């Protein structure tokens, strides 16, 4: 049986969702890449199948190192609004009285959580480090403390990045810059914080000269030059695209004309040549 991914003939057990054959090696690589992107609900690798792989299939096929990550993302996707992970150590905390800091002095202090695992103190409502004397709304408007903490570089990377859609801060422990928010499923870049966008012919976030490209991929220290170059490339493509479309239409029309008139002439000449060789009269 041939694997639908690598096309090699192997002894393969079909996938339970669509009964299509995918070898163990290809399935492991695919699942591992999805876990690295923070996916808990993983779709079947077969493009024409829109179903999700069941948990047992994923756990059976995942490499051992990725099983812990997958279980974390799975728990994160299933939790309700009363349970959130600690911003520092990812330990899940359920909003109960026993997790509060004792003797709250204000109503806002009811949201003050101390992680039982790492003792980090944070706000349950906005999922940020605790902001003493400032409510969540005021803190979000001028969250200097949070931005300072998130922008601090530790172990060669910033502490956290804010999701461009739901504004939840996400901390990366390892993996590539392509992040998927577990709250709203937005794909964004951990380095620059921008959404992943792509448009055929104009490139994507990994393209150096694309208007959608990450600012750290091309001239990060010269933003004005970067915008000028990328804008010029985009403008050039916008000018070239109509010309290519017109050229394609002209060539297509020319091919049709040649086919309509050239093919009968070619057949007639071929028939004439054959008659000449056999000495047959017209």
Curated annotation (Swiss-Prot):
Q: Kindly list the ranges of residues that form RING-type zinc fingers according to the record.
A: 3-49, 163-192
Does Metal-binding appear among the keywords? yes
Q: Which GO terms describe its molecular function?
A: ubiquitin conjugating enzyme binding; ubiquitin protein ligase activity; zinc ion binding
Q: Where does this protein hold Zn(2+) 4? A: 189, 192, 205, 214
Reported EC number(s) for this entry are 2.3.2.31
Q: Which Pfam families match?
A: IBR, IBR_1
| Residues that coordinate or bind Zn(2+) 1 | 3, 6, 23, 26
Q: Where are the transmembrane segments?
A: 243-263
List, from the UniProt record, the residues annotated as the active site of this protein: 176
- Keyword Kinase present in the record's keywords: the answer is no
| An example Gene Ontology biological process | ubiquitin-dependent protein catabolic process
Region: TRIAD supradomain; residue ranges are: 1-218
Instruction: Extract the CDD domains matched here.
Output: BRcat_RBR_RNF217 (cd20342), Rcat_RBR_RNF217 (cd20350), vRING-HC-C4C4_RBR_RNF217 (cd16622)
Show the GO cellular component annotation of the record.
cytoplasm; membrane; ubiquitin ligase complex
Zn finger spans (IBR-type): 68-136
State which pathway it belongs to. Answer: Protein modification; protein ubiquitination
**Which of this chain's residues are annotated to bind Zn(2+) 3?**
163, 166, 181, 184
The main location class comes to: cytoplasm
Family per record: Belongs to the RBR family. RNF217 subfamily.
Described by its record, this protein's role is as follows: E3 ubiquitin-protein ligase which accepts ubiquitin from E2 ubiquitin-conjugating enzymes in the form of a thioester and then directly transfers the ubiquitin to targeted substrates. Mediates the degradation of the iron exporter ferroportin/SLC40A1 and thus regulates iron homeostasis.
Its UniProt domain note says: Members of the RBR family are atypical E3 ligases. They interact with the E2 conjugating enzyme UBE2L3 and function like HECT-type E3 enzymes: they bind E2s via the first RING domain, but require an obligate trans-thiolation step during the ubiquitin transfer, requiring a conserved cysteine residue in the second RING domain.
- Cross-referenced PANTHER family, in alphabetical order? RBR FAMILY RING FINGER AND IBR DOMAIN-CONTAINING
Name of the featured protein: E3 ubiquitin-protein ligase RNF217
* Gene symbol of the encoding locus: rnf217
């Amino acid at each position: 049986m041939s694997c639908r991914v690598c096309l090699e003939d192997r002894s393969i057990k079909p996938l339970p969702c669509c009964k299509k054959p995918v070898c163990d090696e290809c399935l492991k690589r695919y699942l591992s890449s999805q876990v690295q992107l923070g996916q808990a609900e993983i779709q079947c690798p077969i493009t024409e199948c829109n179903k999700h792989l069941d948990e047992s299939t994923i756990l059976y096929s995942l490499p051992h190192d990725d099983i812990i990550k997958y279980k974390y993302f799975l728990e994160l996707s299933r939790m309700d609004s009363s349970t959130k992970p600690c911003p520092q150590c990812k330990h899940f905390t359920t909003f109960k009285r026993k997790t509060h800091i004792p003797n709250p002095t204000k109503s806002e202090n009811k949201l003050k959580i101390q992680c039982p695992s790492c003792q980090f103190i944070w706000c349950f409502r906005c999922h940020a480090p605790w902001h003493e004397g400032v409510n969540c709304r005021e803190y979000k408007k001028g969250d200097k403390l949070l931005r300072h903490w998130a922008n601090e570089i530790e172990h060669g990377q910033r502490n956290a990045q804010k999701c461009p859609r739901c504004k939840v801060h996400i901390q990366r422990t390892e993996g590539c810059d392509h992040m998927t928010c577990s709250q709203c499923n937005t794909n964004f870049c951990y380095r620059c914080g921008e959404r992943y966008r792509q448009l055929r012919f104009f490139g994507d976030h990994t393209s150096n000269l694309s208007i959608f490209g990450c600012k750290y991929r091309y001239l990060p220290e010269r933003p004005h030059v970067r915008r000028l170059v990328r804008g010029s490339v985009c403008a050039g493509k916008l000018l070239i695209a109509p010309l290519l479309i017109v050229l394609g239409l002209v060539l297509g029309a020319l091919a049709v004309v040649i086919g309509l008139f050239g093919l009968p002439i070619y057949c007639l000449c071929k028939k004439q040549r054959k008659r000449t060789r056999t000495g047959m009269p017209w």
